[in-house]
Every structure is written in structure tokens, then in C-alpha cells.
Amino acid sequence: MTNHHQSTRGEPRVALVTCTALPDLDPDDRLALAPLAARGIAAEAVVWDDPAVDWAGYDLVVLRSPWDYALRRDEFVAWARTVPTLVNPADVVAWNTDKRYLAELSAAGVPTVPTTWVEPGADWRPPAETGEYVIKPAVSVGSLDTGRYDLADPEHRELAAAHVRRLSAAGRITMVQPYLRAVDTDGETALLFLAGPDGLAFSHAICKGPMLTGPDQGVAELYREERIDARAATPEQLDTAEKTLAVVPGGTDRLLYARVDLIPGPDGAPVLVELELTEPSLFVGYADGAPDRLAEAVATHLARRS
């Protein structure tokens, strides 16, 4: 990690924002430290809710692994609004940390997983169909508070209803989605985009294996281990990702990074699971040159602000 005094040599200072559980960043993000230093950029990990931090002392504040925000979203968004050099910007964070953004993207023509939104206090009963469904809160990180239920199983039907009641009692909006079985064979494809001289540009893609094996177990870890492999994006996936990014409020030129998570729909065509603009793992360790491209994206944003 770089010391504060290095900035006196005129190096731009960059905060890489994390949480108390990962004070030295996620290992994948650490891969960008050497490329940043090689560009004369003094970067250091900083915990987002550390009251001692002077955010104005940084030339750029880059969200990376503040993965404890889901149960404190209002506090997190309020903090983001106090950091003028934040990327991605605070209004993007406010929009993207509530998954109801998916309804907006769907209305704009982006293919998404069909979703039922259950407001707190609403009376929800499992649908009559007997397929598998995923239940999760609209504000969540990773697979926390997320479960997969087979509605042909009476016990699962009751567990699903209890899951929704539990989230509702906590004042949380719930998402109910059909489980798309192609995930079991194809996994989820994440397409990573990083800022370049001409705006956001495709960098690389990875495949995430399925993680949801059954009902919500109340797992308390910050994030579950995933099986990750490098993957080449298909033209159809790239097209869907670009269509998704084209309808982001405020445009994509001000974004430093974006991750578009796709799975095959019932007809095999890609559908959007999530658009990650807040704190996505960027998986730079899975693609040649990706740590350098991330450092270059930071340098691009610094140059715009100088």
C-alpha cells in the first residue's frame, strides 16, 4: 500500500474503496496496484465508513469492495453523495443499488429475467406454477438472503412464503424470479467494460458457475465462493450488453467500469440478470492485460479531472 506522504511528490492520489472485512482489498483488485504505481499513481485501500478519512484529499475515489453496504444502503448512498470525485458517481450508485432498475431496463427494451416485485406488507403467495423460483431482496450483494425453491415441493412452497415474509418484516422489497435452468449447464457470463480514451470499452468476459443450490440458509458470509473461468463473449452477448449500457441513465461516458451479467433465456438468447455499476468484482486476474486496462481506466479518469 502507498503512504500518504508520497502525494507530496505530485503523484495523483487514488482511494480504492473497500469495507472493514477486506481492509487490504479483494485479491483480484490488488492486481491493479503495480500497474497503477507504474503509471505514477499512488493508490491505497480505504474503508468507506471510516470516519477519519478525508475524501477531499484524493484526486479520485474508486468503488471496489464495499460489500457490507446492502443492509445499510441509505447510509452508503448518503456517504457516496459526499464524495465529489467518486467513480462510479453517486447518482449511479443510488440508481444501481436498488434492483428495481431492472424494471426500467426491461421497459427500455432490454431482455431481462421476468420479475415479480413484492412490497413490504404485501400478501404474497407462491404462484400456481410448479417450476423453480429464485427469491432475493431488491437491495443485496452477492447471494446473501437469496434462495432457490422448487414450487412442486410443498415444503419449498412454505419456505418460499416464509422467505418473502422475513424480508417483508424487515421492510425490504422482494424479487421473485423463475429460475432459468440453462444456468445449470451454461453458468452466468459476466462481460466487463472499462473506461478507455473513447469511453467505456469491452475488456474481457468470465463464466460464473451456478451458486444457488436450494432455500436461503441465512448464510452470513459477505460473499460465497464462486467457480470462475475465463470465457469468450459471443457476438449476441456483446450486443445485449451494449444495448443494456446504451440505456443507462446519464450515459456511460462518466463510468469507470461496468459489468453486465447474462444468462441464456428459455430460447437460448441472452437475458440480463444484473447490471453491476457499483462494486462489481472485475475479475481482472482472468484476462491477460486486464489489470493494466483497469489502471489505464483510472489514469483516463484522472486526466479528465486534471
Identify the residue ranges that each predicted region occupies:
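A short, glycine/Asx- and small/polar-enriched loop/turn
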Residues: 54-59, 128-130, 264-271
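ATP-dependent carboxylate activation and anion-phosphoryl transfer catalytic cores
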Residues: 235-306
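Conserved N-proximal alpha/beta basic substrate-recognition cap immediately N-terminal to
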Residues: 13, 19-119
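Anionic group-transfer/hydrolysis microenvironments
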Residues: 66, 138, 179-180, 192, ...
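A short beta-strand motif that forms the metal-chelation/ATP-contact edge
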Residues: 58-63, 136, 189-193, 268-281
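Active-site nucleotide/adenylate-binding loops and adjacent lid/helix of ATP-dependent enzymes
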Residues: 2-18, 80-84, 90-186, 235-238, ...
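Phosphate-binding site of ATP-dependent enzymes
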Residues: 156-250, 271
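Short, solvent-exposed loop/turn segments at secondary-structure boundaries
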Residues: 27, 147-149, 285-288
